[in-house]
Regions:
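Divalent-cation
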Residues: 2-151, 156, 162-163, 171, ...
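Extended, charge-rich alpha-helical interface modules
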Residues: 182-185
């Protein structure tokens, strides 16, 4: 696949702030760059169940989708994370039905949960990988691009920076918040 980067799951964090947020970290298959994606609690659970190979006594919501598409004759061939904007990642579910390919827009967390169930590959574009990957600061610390952080997390980080009197960081966060609000108008 030209200009695409194949991904695998590297890890998932425990709870972040806000309390129901998790960091799903995807890693390129051939290389070391990592892509952090903030997801909700239910989506994290749907992914974690597959990561630990737990078989629930009854199907979860994400388990129903493969059963349904199989019955309808469609197969998920891959997922593609095609866009990242203001901390939100956008993905396609790429299907094949009787030799015809079609795609459906999806939240990235749902796309990853389904890719695990279908055992199909996950991709992103090289542009997204370049702009959104974690930067290794050494000593087990990483820096996340400000563009990949949600508005809520930016506002909380701004308040924390002000409280700690870290005014240079606060001004960068304030500028990013303003820029995003202007784009929304």
């Amino acid at each position: 696949m030209e200009n695409y980067v194949e991904l695998k799951i590297h890890d998932m964090s425990t709870t972040l702030h806000p309390a129901d947020a998790y960091a799903l970290v995807l890693e390129e298959v051939e290389g070391g760059r990592k892509l952090p994606i903030i997801i909700g609690r239910q989506e994290a659970q749907a992914i974690k169940v597959m990561m630990v190979k737990y078989l629930p006594p009854r199907p979860l919501t994400h388990d129903l989708f493969p059963m349904l598409t199989k019955h309808l004759g469609a197969v998920l061939k891959k997922i593609l994370i095609y866009k990242a904007k203001d901390g939100v990642f956008y993905s396609y579910l790429c299907f094949d039905k009787d030799g015809e390919e079609f795609k459906i827009d999806s939240r990235t967390s749902d796309a990853v949960a389904l890719a695990l169930r279908y055992e199909c590959p996950m991709y992103t574009t090289e542009d997204i990988m370049q702009s959104e990957h974690l930067h290794d600061l050494g000593e087990g610390k990483f820096s996340v691009p400000i563009s990949s952080v949600s508005m809520q997390m930016l506002e909380e980080a701004l308040q924390a920076a002000i409280d700690k009197e870290e005014y240079e960081q606060a001004s960068q966060l304030r500028d990013e918040i303003r820029k995003r609000k202007e784009r929304m108008e």
